Amino acid sequence: MASLYFVTGTDTEVGKTYCTAKTVERMRECGQRVGVYKPVASGCELRADGQRYSVDAATLWQAAGRPKNIDAVCPQRFLAALSPPQSAAREGVKVDTRQLRDGLAIWCDGDFDVVMIEGAGGLFSPISDDWLNVDLAIEMKRWSDQNGHSFELLLVAPDRLGVLHHVISTSRAAESAGIPIAGLILNRMDDHADESTQTNAEDLRRWCGIPMVASVRQPSGPLVVFSGPNGRNASGETSRETAGGVNFLNQTTIRR
């Protein structure tokens, strides 16, 4: 059965796609068969051949080695750079809420050890007229439990002053929804980092007890995975092994 990871952010434009792609590449280097699924994308480009091009979906597909086809990676693609339901409304249609979840099944056919699912925006951003991202994650976890797959959240947040509140509130909301968190990636979006970047990772490990905390030191730099003393997390427990024996990023530095 597959290990499923739902990637969400504390906001939009925090580097979810970059971090997801780097994670996918590392897992493939470790011998994992990785599928990628982006249920819906907005802000797509309309090509001359009439195809809708999502740079995020294409980036994930390329990182995974181009499995299946781009329509399986991202079956719903809209043009306006708005939230998915607003972007769809501009075209006189609605996001197909059920397809958001049902499109996952094609990636859980036994061909993949790991499936990375990238949401749209933050955990409480609307993804359709009926659901927020958290609602989709809950539905996917329910489906995963019924079909014998594991399901966890991977959180991406900007590494800057104020991130403690955003990560703690998001992680507690996820836990209240019954969604376990596999890890956190802090993305340093600005070359001029503030002083909080020296302590954010350690503070979040202590306050959240998240098993894995990583940091992208710049958008073009390496992804460095931090661990607690003796490879233990903030709660003192040995880090969980997921993704077919890979301890998520396994204290690995991923270089662009």
From Swiss-Prot:
Keywords: ATP-binding, Biotin biosynthesis, Cytoplasm, Ligase, Magnesium, Metal-binding, Nucleotide-binding. Pathway: Cofactor biosynthesis; biotin biosynthesis; biotin from 7,8-diaminononanoate: step 1/2. Signal peptide: none annotated. GO terms for cellular component: cytosol. Its main location: cytoplasm. Substrate binds at S42. One of its GO terms (molecular function) is dethiobiotin synthase activity. ATP binds at E13, V14, G15, K16, T17, Y18, D56, E118, G119, A120, G121, N187, R188. Its cofactor is Mg(2+). CDD domains: DTBS. GO terms for biological process: biotin biosynthetic process. Its EC number is 6.3.3.3. Mg(2+) binds at T17, D56, E118. It is found in: Cytoplasm. The keyword Transferase does not apply. It holds the Pfam family AAA_26. It is an enzyme of class 6 (ligase). Belongs to the dethiobiotin synthetase family. Homodimer. Catalyzes a mechanistically unusual reaction, the ATP-dependent insertion of CO2 between the N7 and N8 nitrogen atoms of 7,8-diaminopelargonic acid (DAPA, also called 7,8-diammoniononanoate) to form a ureido ring. This is ATP-dependent dethiobiotin synthetase BioD. The gene is bioD.
